[in-house]
Amino acid sequence: MMPLPMNEFLQQSMQAGGFDLDFEVVEWGAMLLGYRSAPDAPASKGVDALNISLSYTDPSSMFRYWHSTSYSPTNQNWGHWSTPHLDDLLQQAQETFDPGERDKILAQAHALVVDEAPWVWIVHDLNPRAMSPHVKGFHPAQSWSQDFTSITME
């Protein structure tokens, strides 16, 4: 991903909608500290939002991002966003062991998150990469997890 052009595009797009964005550029570790802190904690630097790269490994991960018991600093609901109906759906999904039924519940939860939009999704990473022609054996994964064991240099 290319953070600077992505953020510049975001800033221009939001400005067209009447939002004035300023960025507080910080070192990655400082951003993670802010993300793992409460929104009003000093580590969050008084910002209203975080632009952080997160990956979804499973639809059930919605619980840690949006359930009201998942507020930071103990979990990952940094914005402390909540809605009782979503809490109910996510709790049902946690307690349902039939995969088909759980999928139906998570689909409802997903639809609610899409409609309510607690986050703005910035990018769908299609793995842009640049490398030397001397690198051989590299096959980009369609995820954040990359296997480097097959790479050689010629």
Regions found by a protein language model. Name each.
Residues 1-12, 146:
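Bilobed "Venus flytrap"/periplasmic-binding protein-like clamshell domains
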Residues 42-53, 96-133:
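Bilobed periplasmic-binding protein-like "clamshell/Venus-flytrap" ligand-binding domains
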Residues 13-68, 105:
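Periplasmic binding protein-like
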Residues 1, 29-30, 127-129:
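Short, internal active-site loops enriched in acidic
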Residues 5-9, 16, 30, 34, ...:
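Extracytoplasmic/secreted proteins, especially bacterial periplasmic and envelope-associated proteins
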Residues 36-45, 64-95, 124-154:
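Short, solvent-exposed loop/beta-turn-alpha elements that line the ligand-binding surface or hinge
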Residues 1, 50, 81:
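A short glycine-/small-residue-rich loop at the edge of a beta-strand within enzyme catalytic domains
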